[in-house]
């Protein structure tokens, strides 16, 4: 059994995130912990002195409808009971919401949150600054899900030969061995005539975790058409590593992943060391 964080912020209840948690529970029983956060992270509003300590300034609380949050918690608990999911409910009142979520992630196997609704009250353009921060700071893998999407039945492994890409793929296989028989495509980018990076080693590893594995190298001139292709194949779950880090290749760059998140078309699994 795995511990899954299901994240809700402010007055938002993500139907897409709950749908994914329910799907995972149908594959294998999980413990789902509903984390209900403050509607704003006050860290950005608090001043810091030259020693790095928070300055004692007055901060006006962001308006929150406590009754809505309480109602969302009740909906979460009722739905978990109806689905037969073991659950816990955490009402996190820490003013530094993202710091609290990072702490929660330290004690979880995976986090699920809405790539569409996460702190949309701060900025509706995703990935907004809050989502970017938690993608960098999380201490467990994240499943990003849109609000309206098809449940995945295939896997797309983004591989550039670098350690973070391999780490993400291994984390995915450890968490979801039940997807062994799914059609899986491992893709990499051909740059300057380079060969498939560490092909023998990568194929040796991946073939033991994915029964229906194919490897594909995307030429540089076909990169744009590949980006279009992936957005139209909504039955895939994309596995990628190290969002926002310089180690990402051109094919799986920060801007590419941001475009996928912005498009609200795919489930994305992100993991980093």
Language-model features: where?
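Small/aliphatic-rich secondary-structure junction motif
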Residues: 1-57, 137, 150-218, 235
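Redox-cofactor binding/interface segments in oxidoreductases and associated redox assembly factors
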Residues: 6, 113-114, 157, 240
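Short glycine-rich, flexible loops that bind phosphorylated cofactors or substrates
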Residues: 13, 120, 246-248
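Structural beta-alpha unit
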Residues: 39, 74-111, 208-238, 242-258, ...
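A short acidic, glycine-rich active-site loop
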Residues: 55-70
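Hydrophobic alpha-helical segments and helix pairs
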Residues: 87-145
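Short secondary-structure boundary segments
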Residues: 115-116, 241-243, 272-273
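Short, flexible loop segments at boundaries between secondary-structure elements
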Residues: 263-273
């Amino acid at each position: 059994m795995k511990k899954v964080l299901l994240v809700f912020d402010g007055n938002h209840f993500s139907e897409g995130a709950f749908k994914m948690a329910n799907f995972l529970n149908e594959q294998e029983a999980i413990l789902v912990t509903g984390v209900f956060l403050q509607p704003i992270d006050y860290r950005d509003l608090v001043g810091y002195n030259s020693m790095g300590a928070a300055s004692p300034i007055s901060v006006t609380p962001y308006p929150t409808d406590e009754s809505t949050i309480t109602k969302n918690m009740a909906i979460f608990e009722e739905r978990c009971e109806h689905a037969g999911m073991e659950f816990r409910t955490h009402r996190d009142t820490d003013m530094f919401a993202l710091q609290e979520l990072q702490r929660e992630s330290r004690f979880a196997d995976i986090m699920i949150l809405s790539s569409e609704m996460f702190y949309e009250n701060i900025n509706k353009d995703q990935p907004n600054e809050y989502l970017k921060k938690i993608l960098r700071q999380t201490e467990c893998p994240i499943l990003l899900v849109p609000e309206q999407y098809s449940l995945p039945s295939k896997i797309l492994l983004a591989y550039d030969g670098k350690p973070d890409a391999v780490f993400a793929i291994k984390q995915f296989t450890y968490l979801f061995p039940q997807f062994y028989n799914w059609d899986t495509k491992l893709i990499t980018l051909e740059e300057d005539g380079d060969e498939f990076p560490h092909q023998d080693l990568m194929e040796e590893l991946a073939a033991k975790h994915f029964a229906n594995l194919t490897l594909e190298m995307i030429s540089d001139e076909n990169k744009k058409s590949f980006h279009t292709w992936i957005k139209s194949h909504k039955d895939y779950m994309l596995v990628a590593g190290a969002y926002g880090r310089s180690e990402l290749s051109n094919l799986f760059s920060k801007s590419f992943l941001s475009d996928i998140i912005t498009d609200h078309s795919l489930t994305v699994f992100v993991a980093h060391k």
